Amino acid sequence: MAGRLQDEVERVIVGQRQVLREILTCVLAGGHCLLRGVPGLAKTLLIKTVAQAVDLKFSRIQFTPDLMPSDILGTEVIEEDQTTGRREIRFIPGPIFANIILADEINRTPPKTQSALLEAMQEFQVTIGGVRHALERPLFVLATENPIEQEGTHPLPEAQLDRFMLNVLIDYPSAEDERRILEATTAGVEPEVRKVATGADLENARALVRDLPAAANVIDYALRLARATRPADPAAPAFVRKSVKWGAGPRAGQALLLTAKASALLDGRTVPSLDDVRAVAAPVLRHRVLLTFQAEADGITPDQVVTELLRGN
């Protein structure tokens, strides 16, 4: 199923094979994914194409500065029965009531509205007027964001970032891929995306990923990596204690292990290895490592911290 999905998306998306693999890894692991990159790199198109290839309900939310939480979650309205004159409150679901949610340019809206997704992403429900409304399963939030240095952007709260299993960076295509993009997008025919997977397929794949066995050394390695990002941990190396303000929480270890299993499954293997954990370490940890002000001033990035951790482990 994952192979068919990848092949179908690549009929539309040129290049970005590693980015697509990381997104599929996240989907198979049952998590939410955040794509970060400058405008014009097909982040939105990539997510829309993945959604079109799956037979699930799709919803797009365009995050803007004036977006309100009710625009995402839904709202309650008072309706009057024309016959009896009786009034009652009716809940109108928002776009979050879908299976695949494209949260486009999520950091264009203030943190208050961004935080409206917290309960939905973690507990698969929303609370409106004190009433809980269950969301549809499966639920995948695939969000895009522009670099925070750009005008009109707001940093995502740490609690919001931690809800995303992976933070995937998308970069400029190679010269060869960009030439293929020019040829494909200036022609008269656009490829039609076929549905090659169902919601049941994704749920079965997710269950299979969780059922895959992991050796004790793989579990210990994922645990060690996550704990090594915390400056207060006795096992943290000196550069972490110097450069990191806050490290990754327990969700990071869970994400490392689940995405390592999903990565192994994508390669046709049923047992994850240490290399699988290393392969997903950067997208799992980069948004969970908060640097000190001095480290940022020195030009250090979370990816550099993760790279150093992998060298020492």
Model feature map: region roles:
Residues 1-41:
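Pre-Walker A (pre-P-loop) alpha-helix and adjacent loop at the N terminus of AAA/AAA+ ATPase modules
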Residues 22-25, 79-102:
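Conserved alpha-helical scaffold flanking the Walker A/P-loop in AAA+ ATPase domains
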Residues 27-65:
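Walker A/P-loop
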Residues 33, 101, 139:
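Conserved beta-strand position immediately N-terminal to the Walker
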Residues 37, 104-105, 116:
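Walker B catalytic acidic pair
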Residues 38, 72, 144:
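P-loop (Walker A) phosphate-binding loop of NTP-binding proteins
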Residues 79-84, 109-113, 121-211, 261-263:
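Canonical AAA+ ATPase core
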Residues 232-313:
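C-terminal engagement/docking regions of AAA+ P-loop ATPases
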